[in-house]
């Protein structure tokens, strides 16, 4: 059985400890005369929600995931009073499925005599993104990454080995337990609580409050019981995780219910919407996507420190054949060898997509594995894996044109026999012809979208900027919400850079807010 890591996989992981809301009494911003600024709002008072409760804090962090927790701890360490508003009942967000973080020049690396060329790494990442990402932010992140790891260690975060994971350099710092559930979330949550950070769980941030000058000075949020809370603050830090759940917003990029499955729950786009509503500039046309390919309704399971599945791993097998809803081949099937995140992209150009295999291929792949056999049976029962006695019947089962599928098979097998994929250039060692007679299979695959990366335009301080590239005072977007270092796809050349960016952006935004807003 092949093991597959899921960097953005979210589940109800038992190792993540829920923490109750910290009492709000006694928490207030520094009394330096600036509090009067928080009473004004730029919104129409007749339309503004009527709060049942009003709170006062220096900094409000929306979202208690990887970047949100980093922001909370940094803010408390900097002497600010902090409230964290989290829609779920526990802290952690997507951090529970993150296996480790990128860094250069951490003390852990120094102790192991690991050295890496920063310039070469930065150039490779810029080239892979076709220079559509922010070189300045990327450079800042790389140069600060080692100190960020050291800072996390000082907060109780536990790391294990350092290797290259799937990238080019030995820069991936594995969490001690293999995921962030116990090694990151638990110690950072405990540190935040110990430093006096207030948490409002089961509370959804809905709307930002601006003063007459356009600065963000607070927000409205709604608790699970419908109670409306107004939080007056000097800075709002959005750590809301993007909008991977919002297929209505993703439709313009080709993602539909037929070809895509959002895999990270809670990414409802509320942070994006709130920022746009107060003049923030959208970066959706240039944002990156973190995801991959999955077999729907056959979820991965956690085993031995990895998220595992048999059928879900098929998209990473290069010797199969991919076809669209018409039965046409549309890509070189070894694309995952460069980056398994890339596999999501060609699928969004299709209405539907399927992996085709003959009986010998399926038997070789499953290899008698009990879990694999169960998934094969379950998939057929759910109508996502199709089995037929011939290709014509299989075409009918998946709704493809039998004549087109026949032409596809003839062309593909011809390329296999020639040892040259003249259609899409798949490496010859992966060109395995499909039997034209006997039992055959089709496995439906969809894009598995874990995160949108960088839907809001931000500057080097992670201030959200307006359409004139001017920062909106008091408003920040961190983590994947405000990421400017990926375009189109999460490249993974710098393994763990998403998690590292979460830490760096959360800390950087807070330090700028403390310097300029408090």
Predicted regions and their residues:
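Conserved N-terminal/central alpha/beta ligand/cofactor-binding core
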Residues: 46-48, 81, 87-198, 202-204, ...
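Beta1/beta-strand and adjacent pyrophosphate-binding region of the FAD-binding site
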Residues: 53-65
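Core beta-strand elements of the Rossmann-like FAD/NAD(P) dinucleotide-binding domain
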Residues: 55-57, 226-235
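N-terminal secretory signal peptides and thylakoid transit peptides that target proteins
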Residues: 1-17
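Glycine-rich loop(s) and the adjacent beta-strand/alpha-helix scaffold that form part
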Residues: 235-298, 493-495, 499-508
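An anion/pyrophosphate-binding glycine-rich loop and adjacent beta-alpha core
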Residues: 272-400
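A glycine-rich dinucleotide-binding beta-alpha-beta segment and adjacent secondary-structure elements
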Residues: 404-489
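Conserved beta-strand-loop-beta-strand element in the redox core of flavoprotein oxidoreductases
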Residues: 209-230
């Amino acid at each position: 059985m092949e093991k597959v890591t899921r960097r953005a996989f979210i589940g109800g992981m038992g190792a993540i400890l829920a923490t109750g809301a910290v009492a709000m009494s006694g928490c207030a911003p520094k009394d330096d005369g600036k509090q009067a600024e928080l009473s004004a709002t730029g919104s129409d008072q007749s339309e503004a929600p009527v709060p049942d409760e009003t709170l006062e804090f220096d900094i409000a962090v929306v979202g208690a995931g990887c970047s949100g927790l980093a922001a909370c701890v940094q803010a408390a360490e900097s002497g600010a009073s902090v409230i964290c508003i989290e829609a779920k009942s526990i802290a952690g967000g997507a951090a529970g499925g993150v296996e480790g973080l990128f860094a250069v020049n951490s003390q852990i690396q120094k102790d192991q005599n690991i050295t890496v060329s920063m310039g070469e790494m930065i150039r490779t990442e810029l080239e892979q993104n076709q220079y559509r990402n922010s070189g300045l932010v990327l450079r800042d992140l790389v140069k600060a990454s080692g100190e960020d790891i050291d800072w996390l260690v000082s907060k109780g975060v536990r790391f294990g080995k350092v290797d290259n994971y799937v990238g080019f350099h030995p820069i991936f710092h594995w969490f001690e337990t293999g995921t962030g559930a116990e090694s990151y979330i638990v110690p950072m949550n405990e540190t935040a609580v110990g430093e006096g950070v207030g948490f409002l769980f089961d509370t959804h941030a809905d709307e930002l409050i601006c003063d007459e000058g356009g600065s963000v000075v607070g927000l409205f949020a709604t608790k699970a019981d419908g109670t409306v809370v107004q939080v007056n603050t000097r800075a709002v830090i959005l750590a809301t995780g993007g909008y991977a759940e919002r297929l209505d917003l993703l439709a313009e990029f080709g993602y539909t219910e037929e070809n895509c499955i959002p895999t990270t729950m809670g990414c409802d786009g509320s942070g994006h919407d709130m920022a746009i509503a107060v003049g923030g500039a959208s970066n959706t046309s240039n944002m990156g996507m973190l995801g991959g390919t999955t077999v729907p309704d056959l979820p991965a399971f956690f085993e031995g420190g990895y998220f595992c599945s048999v059928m879900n791993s098929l998209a990473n097998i290069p010797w199969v054949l991919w076809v669209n809803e018409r039965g046409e081949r549309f890509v070189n099937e070894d694309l995952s060898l460069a980056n398994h995140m890339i596999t999501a992209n060609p699928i969004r150009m299709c209405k539907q997509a399927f992996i085709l295999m003959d009986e010998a291929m399926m038997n070789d792949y499953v290899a008698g594995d009990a879990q694999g056999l169960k998934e094969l049976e379950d998939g057929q029962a759910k109508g996502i894996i199709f089995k037929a006695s011939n290709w014509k019947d299989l075409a009918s089962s998946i709704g493809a044109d039998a004549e087109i599928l026949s032409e596809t098979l003839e062309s593909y097998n011809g390329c296999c026999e020639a040892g040259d994929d003249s259609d899409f250039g798949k490496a010859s060692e992966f060109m395995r012809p499909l039997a034209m007679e006997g039992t055959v299979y089709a496995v439906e695959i969809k894009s598995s979208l874990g995160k949108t990366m960088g839907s809001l335009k931000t500057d080097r301080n992670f201030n959200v900027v307006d359409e004139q590239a001017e920062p909106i005072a008091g408003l920040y977007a961190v983590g994947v919400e405000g990421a400017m270092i990926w375009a189109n796809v999460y490249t993974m050349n710098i393994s763990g850079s998403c998690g590292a960016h979460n830490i760096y952006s959360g800390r950087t935004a807070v330090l700028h807010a403390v310097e300029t807003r408090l």
